Design a protein with these regions (language model features):
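Extreme N-terminal starter segment of soluble prokaryotic enzymes
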Residues: 1-5
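Loop-to-helix element that buttresses phosphate recognition and phosphoryl-transfer chemistry
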Residues: 6-63, 113-128
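Phosphate-coordination/substrate-recognition cap region in phosphate-metabolizing enzymes
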Residues: 38-101
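Glycine-rich phosphate-binding loop signature in dinucleotide/nucleotide-binding domains
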Residues: 45-48, 134-141
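Active-site signature of alpha/beta-hydrolase-fold catalytic machinery across serine-
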Residues: 66, 154-158
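Short basic (Lys/Arg) and small-residue
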Residues: 148
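Domain-level recognition of soluble alpha/beta enzyme cores
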Residues: 162-186
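Acidic, His/Gly-rich catalytic cores of divalent-metal-dependent hydrolytic chemistry
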Residues: 188-208
Length: 208
């Protein structure tokens, strides 16, 4: 059985500012860096990781780095694990889009693409294909894949035969297990974030 460990990147600058990021390359905050370290420690203590993959965006690569460095593994980057492309909404504050483009946002919440952006089916198909290739290339191994809220959500929805709308976005630096038996995917534990609870009372320190 192949076990894929999907980790959403730590908090980014745009996450903190409540802005749409999409595929723009935005760095982690100090809190995000600490989340990556703590999640890395959790992974190293609970799994024997054989390979590391990541979206090619720096916030995902930085989240994979603590594990890769500790194990002396290379990080294999693949742009197919990127976040959904959000088109005209990239860089915009979420509150502004909700207020000024309410109709567009309502349609987006029901599964339509953002104006000029990527469709949900395009996102789902590219992430699924990349995941399938990684799983087939690593039989009976445990693989870390650092990605994004939207891309992980799309994959979990497809494997769970659900719609994106009904699957919640994973929290920053949370861990979700995807299992592969050589033919089919199945979901293991999803959205694990208990290891981050020590940070909840410390966030003000990192946001100042």
């Amino acid at each position: 059985m192949t076990k894929l460990l999907f980790v959403r990147h730590g908090e980014s600058i745009y996450n903190n500012e409540r802005r749409f990021t999409g595929q723009k390359d935005i760095a982690l905050t100090r809190l995000g860096e600490r989340q990556a370290q703590i999640t890395g420690k959790f992974l190293l203590e609970n799994y024997t990781i054989d390979a590391v993959y990541s979206s090619d965006l720096s916030r995902a690569v930085a989240t994979a780095r603590p594990v890769a460095d500790a194990l002396g593994l290379s990080i294999h980057t693949d742009p197919r694990f990127r976040e959904v492309h959000l088109g005209d909404w990239t860089d915009e504050y979420i509150s502004v889009v909700k207020a000024d483009r309410a109709d567009e946002y309502a349609r987006y919440c029901q599964g339509e693409s953002a104006p000029g952006g990527e469709s949900r089916s395009q996102l789902r198909d590219r992430v699924y294909q990349a995941t399938l290739e990684v799983a087939r290339a690593n039989p009976d191994k445990t693989v870390l894949i650092t990605a994004h809220g939207g891309s992980i959500r799309a994959l979990l929805a497809k494997i769970g035969e659900d719609t994106n709308v009904n699957v919640p976005i994973s929290s920053n630096a949370s861990v979700s297990e995807v299992l592969f038996n050589g033919e089919r995917f199945a979901l293991g534990k999803v959205g694990m974030a208990e290891h981050l609870k020590e940070l909840f009372s410390m966030q003000d320190e990192f946001l100042n």
